[in-house]
Regions:
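Alpha-helical transmembrane segments of polytopic membrane transporters and translocases
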Residues: 15-36, 68-72
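Membrane-interface helix-loop junctions in multi-pass transport and translocation proteins
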Residues: 134, 142-182, 192, 210, ...
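Interfacial segments at transmembrane-helix termini and the short loops linking adjacent helices
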Residues: 16, 82-114
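Membrane-proximal transmembrane or re-entrant/amphipathic helices at the cytosolic face
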Residues: 214-271
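Helix-loop junctions and terminal segments of transmembrane helices
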Residues: 34-53
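Short alpha-helical transmembrane segments in multi-pass integral membrane proteins
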Residues: 62-92, 162-188, 201-202
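Helix-terminus/linker motif at the lipid-water interface of multi-pass membrane proteins
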Residues: 1-24, 49, 89-98
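Membrane-interface junctions at transmembrane-helix termini in multi-pass inner-membrane proteins
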Residues: 112-142, 152-153
Length: 271
């Protein structure tokens, strides 16, 4: 807010209003990562245990499972928030439609950023399990520096002002994840093949995002604008789930290490 007031000359009321738009988006930004922590907590100890036994092959499988499950959860959650940012905010904040509309811009970028927050959590856990605790500290420092610099430049630009904040947040976490993945590739002998790991989830998520946005565009013609987003989300979930199972993006080995993993695998008929 100080940048908005001191550099751009906004009044305190105007700066507060702009910052309020950003915080609307931040409220939903923190939700997807909260679902990733249980995945990391359940799988990372498996990596450490396998390494303690000297079973590097098992450690490699657990590493791949941790990253894959994180990707399978984070991609649809973040992409969904991004492509349906406006409708979701209008549903949650009907009393302030103008603010919800303005906040949609922020959530569009923050939705993408939360994908990388989730991947940061998982990759940090993997590096710590391999005894590379200093690397997440270094990459977080690099991301923090980039965030500060880009935030100062973009928020201080009258053309972008507070709209630069979510973009700088996205830059920050993208850098952290890229550096973490490079570190895993160099430090982990049994590193997973990244193309194999990310290709199917990315493809499925792209189709899901198109389905979500397209179905909302159709539903809003026959339902109240505020409520049309709910069936659109349901359609997106179904599309993603069906494609993930049909294309083999989720296997029994991926979920077996989760709490109730055996039961989940049986329910989904995973092999």
């Amino acid at each position: 807010m100080s940048t908005l007031q001191n550099t751009l000359g906004y009044t305190e009321a105007a700066a507060t209003a702009l910052y309020g738009e950003y915080t609307f988006g931040m409220t939903l930004f923190v939700l997807p990562p909260s679902f990733i922590y249980p995945v990391t907590v359940s799988l990372v100890p498996d990596i450490a245990d396998a390494l303690a036994r000297g079973d590097r092959a098992a450690a490699g499988r657990s590493t791949a499972a941790a990253l894959k499950l994180t990707t399978l959860v984070a991609l649809p959650a973040g992409a969904g928030l991004s492509v349906l940012a406006g409708p979701i905010l209008h549903l949650l904040y009907p009393a302030v439609p103008e603010t919800a509309e303005a906040a949609a811009y922020h959530l569009t970028f923050l939705g993408l950023a939360c994908i990388f927050v989730c991947l940061m959590v998982a990759t940090n856990g993997v590096l710590q399990a391999y005894g590379k605790e200093y690397i997440p500290v270094f990459t977080l420092l690099c991301g923090g520096v980039l965030k500060i610099v880009t935030n100062y430049l973009m928020v201080g630009d009258p053309a972008t002002n507070v709209r630069g904040a979510p973009v700088s947040t996205l830059y920050c976490y993208v850098l952290i994840v890229v550096l973490n993945l490079i570190a895993i590739a160099r430090c982990v002998p049994e590193r997973p093949a990244y193309i194999h790991l990310f290709a199917k989830p990315l493809l499925i998520t792209a189709v899901m995002a198109i389905a979500a946005r397209s179905s909302y565009g159709v539903l809003v013609r026959c339902l109240p604008e505020r409520w049309a987003v709910l069936p659109a989300i349901l359609i997106a979930v179904v599309v993603y789930g069906v494609l993930a199972l049909a294309l083999g993006a989720v296997t029994r080995a991926d979920v077996i290490g989760l709490p109730k993993g055996e039961k989940i695998a049986e329910i989904l008929h995973l092999r």
